[in-house]
Amino acid sequence: MSKFVFVTGGVVSSIGKGIVAASLGRLLKSRGYSVSILKLDPYLNVDPGTMSPFQHGEVFVTEDGAETDLDLGHYERFTDTAMTRLNSVTTGSIYQAVINKERRGSYNGGTVQVIPHITGEIRERIHRVASNSNADIVITEIGGTVGDIESLPFLEAIREFKNDVNKNDVTYIHVTLLPYIKTSGEIKTKPTQHSVKELRSIGIQPDLLVCRSDKEINDSLKRKLSGFCGVNLNCVIEALDADSIYSVPLSLKKEGLCKETLRCLDLEDKECDLESWEKIIHNLRNPGNPIKVALVGKYIELGDAYLSVVEALRHACIEQKAFLDLHWVSAEMIEEKSAEEYLHDVDAIVVPGGFGNRGVNGKIASIKFAREKKIPFLGLCLGMQCAVIEWARNVVQLPGASSSELDPESENPVIHLLPEQEDIVDLGGTMRLGVYPCRLQKNTTGKELYNEDVIYERHRHRYEFNNFYKQIFVDSGYKISGTSPDGRLVELIELVNHPYFLACQYHPEFLSRPGKPHPLFKGLIKASREKLEQSK
């Protein structure tokens, strides 16, 4: 039977609850416990699939095709465990489920209310994750901040949850901020005291406090927090600002987070094996020469819009013992000026996914520059589509070559809408989503990198390579190195006579892990490093 840990946040938003939950998951897994992590998001969207990246950051896609919060990416990367659509819950999805049940008559004519129906649905979702995953411990992160109106149903639900299970099967962790007041030279505990008071007023007494701070928390402050907040002294956990999110599990282990959590859950504190994780941190803190990577995107004002891409690059650099020198390049600025101006001194170019016309010509210009100047290049999703358009326009010289998404009247739509998408009107959850197989062709870079005949990658797209032009591309020197098993969909393309030029329709960044970088990103960094060494 599963045990349950609930992670709440206080004082300010974006305090790092997701990293704390993911780090605890890593620590528990290193002790031999199986873990699943669930995110409860208080917004009314059914999922983040239709939200602007500027509003929400990236949309993380699970194996079973759910469009979820980026925190699920942290959960997967830290625990190396695949999450499912059950691991992402929003207020919108809860209300949708309850209203659908009411329409079906499932409540036998009763008045549908927040309590017990909404809170009951939330509790049911948590139990469902436990039964589906068979995890020893289910960690649930509650989005938002204690005191927010929109979070109240979730907080009430996790209060009620303690009545569903045995007393020692539930633990509450509260992540909070201890601000440092520069003028007085003091760390203030009052905001945390008020946050815990607010949590208690709901009926939740936290078992552990994880205290974010940029200054060390002395024993006197810990005793003060212990006394005012009713938390065991050993359960006041210091969480100092870290040089990398990947060092957080080691810091929290030192502070005893996992040990105290297991004590609260009445579970054995088994021997901890973090040797591989410590090696990752060692390589991260002792990098070799820098690799200057340009990420050419349209949402670069918010780095979280490309979070998994950046982490995948970082994983590859850690494994290759290189320093990631990441340069954010606006595709629109390239349109205004030139690719040469922004990319003349980079070692690699990555063009990630996206939607719509804005910045596309800048991406295409970047790809042309990478192709002609022999700069290692990796295109992802829309990045592959732009690579196809670039080749069609500048090498094959097809008049008006484009994508039917970008130009519905194009006389040469080398990228077109998937046939099964033609009658779909709704936007949310209707793309080609989740894991699909891809068969790799012999004697290709793709086959060499993966060393597999069939791979499984995650997708999120409506448009695809137009097979009407396949032979034209092959005859002109393009290699189609990966397709769907039936050969109908082009999944991976590459160029010969180039140090590294690959583009894929899928999202390989979602499968990259610290210590296990994705082959395409590993290949990109390796090719960049080798090209640098040859130029010396």
Swiss-Prot record:
Which terms are listed as keywords in the entry?
ATP-binding, Glutamine amidotransferase, Ligase, Magnesium, Metal-binding, Nucleotide-binding, Pyrimidine biosynthesis
* Extra information: CTPSs have evolved a hybrid strategy for distinguishing between UTP and CTP. The overlapping regions of the product feedback inhibitory and substrate sites recognize a common feature in both compounds, the triphosphate moiety. To differentiate isosteric substrate and product pyrimidine rings, an additional pocket far from the expected kinase/ligase catalytic site, specifically recognizes the cytosine and ribose portions of the product inhibitor.
Region Amidoligase domain: start-end pairs: 1-267
Q: Where does UTP bind?
A: S13, K188, T189, K190, P191, T192, Q193, K224
Give me the reactions it catalyses.
UTP + L-glutamine + ATP + H2O = CTP + L-glutamate + ADP + phosphate + 2 H(+); L-glutamine + H2O = L-glutamate + NH4(+); UTP + NH4(+) + ATP = CTP + ADP + phosphate + 2 H(+)
Q: What does this protein do?
A: Catalyzes the ATP-dependent amination of UTP to CTP with either L-glutamine or ammonia as the source of nitrogen. Regulates intracellular CTP levels through interactions with the four ribonucleotide triphosphates.
- Give the annotated active site: C381, H507, E509
- State where Mg(2+) binds: D71, E141
What does the entry list as the binding residues for CTP?
A: S13, D148, I149, E150, K188, T189, K190, P191, T192, Q193, K224
CDD domains according to UniProt: CTPS_N, GATase1_CTP_Synthase
The pathway where this protein functions is: Pyrimidine metabolism; CTP biosynthesis via de novo pathway; CTP from UDP: step 2/2
The protein's superkingdom reads Bacteria
Q: Could you tell me what this protein is called?
A: CTP synthase
Q: Record-annotated residues binding ATP?
A: S14, I15, G16, K17, G18, I19, D71
**An annotated GO BP:** pyrimidine nucleobase biosynthetic process
Q: List the record's Gene Ontology CC terms alphabetically.
A: cytosol
Sorted alphabetically, which InterPro entries does this protein's record hold?
Class_I_gatase-like (IPR029062), CTP_synthase (IPR004468), CTP_synthase_N (IPR017456), GATASE (IPR017926), GATase1_CTP_Synthase (IPR033828), P-loop_NTPase (IPR027417)
Main EC class the enzyme belongs to: ligase
Q: Extract the Pfam families matched here.
A: CTP_synth_N (PF06418), GATase (PF00117)
Q: Which family does it belong to?
A: Belongs to the CTP synthase family.
* Activity regulation statement: Allosterically activated by GTP, when glutamine is the substrate; GTP has no effect on the reaction when ammonia is the substrate. The allosteric effector GTP functions by stabilizing the protein conformation that binds the tetrahedral intermediate(s) formed during glutamine hydrolysis. Inhibited by the product CTP, via allosteric rather than competitive inhibition.
Cross-referenced Gene3D superfamilies, in alphabetical order?
3.40.50.880, P-loop containing nucleotide triphosphate hydrolases
Domain Glutamine amidotransferase type-1 as annotated: residue spans: 292-534
Q: What is its EC number?
A: 6.3.4.2
